[in-house]
Curated annotation (Swiss-Prot):
Gene3D superfamilies listed in its UniProt record: HUPs (3.40.50.620)
Function description: Catalyzes the ATP-dependent 2-thiolation of cytidine in position 32 of tRNA, to form 2-thiocytidine (s(2)C32). The sulfur atoms are provided by the cysteine/cysteine desulfurase (IscS) system.
Further facts: Present in outer membrane vesicle formulations which are used as vaccines in human. The thiolation reaction likely consists of two steps: a first activation step by ATP to form an adenylated intermediate of the target base of tRNA, and a second nucleophilic substitution step of the sulfur (S) atom supplied by the hydrosulfide attached to the Fe-S cluster.
Binding site for [4Fe-4S] cluster: C118, C121, C209
Note describing how the cofactor binds: Binds 1 [4Fe-4S] cluster per subunit. The cluster is chelated by three Cys residues, the fourth Fe has a free coordination site that may bind a sulfur atom transferred from the persulfide of IscS.
Name of protein: tRNA-cytidine(32) 2-sulfurtransferase
């Protein structure tokens, strides 16, 4: 096999893997429904470009109809290349809206010099995007957070916030008017990096505001990347844990009635299981290779009727 042919094969596997990961997340959490109008938040980074690209692929083949509109918030950061996103979106024929709001000056005026601006900037941006979604008549807001973002948020909240809380794949917006979805919830960041290189997206740098990166998030990110390198399968195991929560073996009295626990009561997940050695597979699969010797993680899900976004459009007469 030639080097070129091998690379093409790898590229096809990557595209298929991403498409199926996004499709699985959409199916598992019922993210997209018939006639949805989805506002895809496009920052100019690799994640949001990939999100839009994969949703367009699914839109072309899915058995349901839904609309996509790309929205970028131009926050008037110094050096922001205003022409990049409109040029790209027009070239691929995607409806879009550029919202111009000078949040950069607001943040700089409110915060002291040298302080991390990300938190305040994020709150301002969220409010503007909610307003824009309402103006456009969108039923869903799609964000580009991926699996690594979700795990990083879990550890940030555990280490620095004292909460067992991550980033939900689907939620109701703060104002209660919109459903926010994260179709990249099952996607690995390293796959998104490869995909951006493959597709040659016109990436816009994320540090134009000059803000220092969040040190805590950087530490967590480095930790996860180190674990992924040294302990294959650990990241997959941790993400699986988010989908297999056992409240009776934690310590939150709001989630489980410890006070009302009585003798003879049968627990769904067993009572003393935490004291026994758990049977764990020697190796977890991350889904990147088709290897029958690996044990793939399949979280238990309740049966429910949802539309399979990965299915094909129904054939029409004469097709």
């Amino acid at each position: 096999m030639s080097k070129k042919t091998k690379q093409e094969l790898e590229n096809n596997k990557l595209s298929k893997r991403l498409r199926h990961a996004v499709g699985d997340a959409i199916n598992d959490f019922n993210m997209i429904e018939p006639d949805d109008k989805i506002m895809v938040c496009l920052s100019g980074g690799k994640d949001s470009y990939a999100l839009l690209d994969i949703l367009r692929q699914l839109q072309a083949s899915a058995p349901i109809d839904f609309q996509l509109v790309a929205v970028n918030l131009d926050q008037k950061q110094p050096g922001f290349p205003e022409e990049v996103l409109p040029t790209y979106l027009e070239s691929i024929g995607v409806p879009y809206k550029i919202v111009e709001e000078d949040t950069y000056s607001t943040v700089k005026r409110v915060l002291d010099e040298g302080k991390t601006t990300c938190s305040l900037c994020s709150r301002l941006r969220r409010g503007i995007l909610y307003r824009t979604a309402k103006e456009l008549g969108c039923t869903k807001i799609a964000l580009g957070h991926h699996r690594d973002d979700i795990l990083a948020t879990l550890f940030l909240n555990m280490f620095y916030g004292g909460k067992l809380k991550a980033m939900p794949p689907k939620l109701v917006s703060d104002n209660g008017e919109h459903i926010v979805i994260r179709p990249l919830a099952y996607v690995k960041e390293k796959d998104l990096i490869k995909y951006a290189e493959l597709k040659q997206f016109p990436i816009i740098p994320c540090n134009l505001c000059g803000s220092q990166p969040n040190l805590q998030r950087q530490v967590i990110g480095d930790m996860l990347r180190d674990w992924d390198k040294r302990f294959p399968g650990r990241i997959e195991s941790m993400f699986s844990a988010l989908q297999n929560v056992v409240p009776s073996h934690l310590a939150d009295t709001e989630l489980f009635d410890f006070v009302g626990l009585e003798r003879g009561q049968s627990l769904k997940h067993g009572g003393d299981l935490a004291f026994d050695s758990e049977k764990m597979p020697e190796r977890f699969s991350d889904g990147s290779e088709e290897d029958e010797s690996e044990i793939k993680i399949e979280p238990q899900k309740a049966e429910r009727k949802v539309i399979n976004i990965l299915a094909n459009k129904p054939k029409t007469c004469g097709s």
